């Protein structure tokens, strides 16, 4: 009977996917400027930017306000697709980890489901989209006609032509490690905070207020950046580099990049851009979960609260 009850009360994966896609659109529009600043700081090897505020003001002063939304199209598209896949695949993985007797998912199952969803999104969506986004964001100046890449599609075509299709998957290894770890921690923590703070259990028909979802999402999104900082820096460096005139590249892979950055710039450089990540990821999770929880909450209220047992 317990299993039958749980199956009646379960939110289907497609609804999780829809909720994630809507949350991704809102998050992208709100937080793109922070992502641009983070990328510029991580690519700054000569100290051109003195910090977040200086970087942002310099970008606006030298390139215009619109420059803070450079790469928005691939960023918004990538976030929407990423959250659709993340939320949907995580729900499917959790179904596989459900206890056959109680129908519940353990913290271990939740952690592994999140890691699997993070790995899947990293390989299928995040890596190629972030390669294009970072290449666009690193272009500096006020004259677009002088840019190497004219837009997302032109950028992708140029990378494929000059570096082969594999160029779109530059930095795949650190991206997999970053996203897998981030989502494992995030999904586990979000569920724990919902229960601890609001006594909210999935399938109970209770809809969290947006501010409650934002608090849980914000707290759940804080741990990842500290754990995955080096992977994010290495990912950005690998994605930003292109082959020189002789066909060579600066970083040969994830391990070589970590060693090179540590040797040339010091240990702290592996956490460069941490503050803007903390300014972007926890608020991003707060925004995304505020939207996603409303969508799934309405579904619970309409279809699950009075579902027959």
From Swiss-Prot:
GO molecular function: succinate transmembrane transporter activity
Gene Ontology CC: mitochondrial inner membrane; mitochondrial membrane
Transmembrane domains' residue ranges: 17-37, 65-85, 111-131, 171-191, 214-234, 273-293
Keywords: Membrane, Mitochondrion, Mitochondrion inner membrane, Repeat, Transmembrane, Transmembrane helix, Transport
Domain of life: Eukaryota
UniProt xrefs under InterPro entries: Mitochondrial_sb/sol_carrier, Mt_carrier_dom_sf, TXTP-like
Bilayer topology term: Multi-pass membrane protein
Solcar repeat ranges, renumbered to this chain: 11-96, 108-196, 208-298
Localization terms from the record: Mitochondrion inner membrane
Entry's Gene Ontology BP terms: alpha-ketoglutarate transport; citrate transport; malate transport; succinate transport
Tissue specificity note: Expressed in root tips, cotyledons, hypocotyls, leaves, trichomes, stems, flowers, carpels, anthers, pollen and abscission zone of siliques.
Listed Pfam families: Mito_carr
Primary localization: mitochondrion
Family the UniProt entry places it in: Belongs to the mitochondrial carrier (TC 2.A.29) family.
Function: May transport cytoplasmic succinate, derived from fatty acid oxidation, into the mitochondrial matrix in exchange of fumarate during lipid mobilization in seed germination. Conversion of seed-reserved triacylglycerols into sucrose is necessary for growth before the onset of photosynthesis and involves fatty acid beta-oxidation, the glyoxylate cycle and gluconeogenesis.
Name of the protein in its database record: Mitochondrial succinate-fumarate transporter 1
Source organism per UniProt: Arabidopsis thaliana
Lineage: Eukaryota, Viridiplantae, Streptophyta, Embryophyta, Tracheophyta
């Amino acid at each position: 009977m317990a299993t039958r009850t749980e199956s009646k009360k379960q939110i289907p994966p497609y609804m999780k996917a829809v909720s994630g896609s809507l949350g991704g659109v809102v998050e992208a529009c709100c937080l793109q400027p922070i992502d641009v600043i983070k990328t510029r700081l991580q690519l700054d090897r000569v100290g051109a930017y003195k910090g977040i505020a200086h970087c942002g003001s310099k970008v606006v002063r030298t390139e215009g306000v619109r420059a803070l939304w450079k790469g928005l199209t691939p960023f918004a598209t990538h976030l929407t697709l990423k959250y659709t896949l993340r939320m949907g695949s995580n729900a499917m993985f959790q179904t596989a980890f459900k206890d056959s007797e109680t129908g519940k998912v353990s913290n271990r199952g939740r952690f592994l489901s999140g890691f699997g969803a993070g790995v899947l999104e990293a390989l299928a969506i995040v890596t190629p989209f972030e390669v294009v986004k970072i290449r666009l964001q690193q272009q500096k100046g006020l004259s677009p006609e002088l840019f190497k890449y004219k837009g997302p599609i032109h950028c992708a075509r140029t990378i494929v032509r000059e570096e082969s299709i594999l160029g779109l998957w530059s930095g795949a290894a650190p991206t997999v490690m970053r996203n897998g770890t981030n989502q494992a921690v995030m999904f586990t923590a979000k569920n724990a905070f919902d229960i601890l703070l609001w006594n909210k259990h999935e399938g109970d028909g209770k809809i969290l207020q947006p501010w409650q979802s934002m608090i849980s999402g914000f707290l759940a999104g804080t741990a990842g950046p500290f754990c995955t900082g080096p992977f994010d820096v290495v990912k950005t460096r690998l994605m930003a580099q292109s082959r020189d005139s002789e066909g060579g590249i600066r970083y040969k892979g994830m391990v070589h990049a970590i060693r090179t950055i540590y040797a040339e710039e010091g240990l702290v450089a592996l956490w460069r851009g941490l503050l803007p990540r903390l300014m972007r990821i926890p608020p991003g999770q707060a925004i995304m979960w505020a939207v996603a929880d409303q969508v799934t909450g309405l579904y619970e209220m309409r279809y699950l609260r009075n579902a027959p047992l």
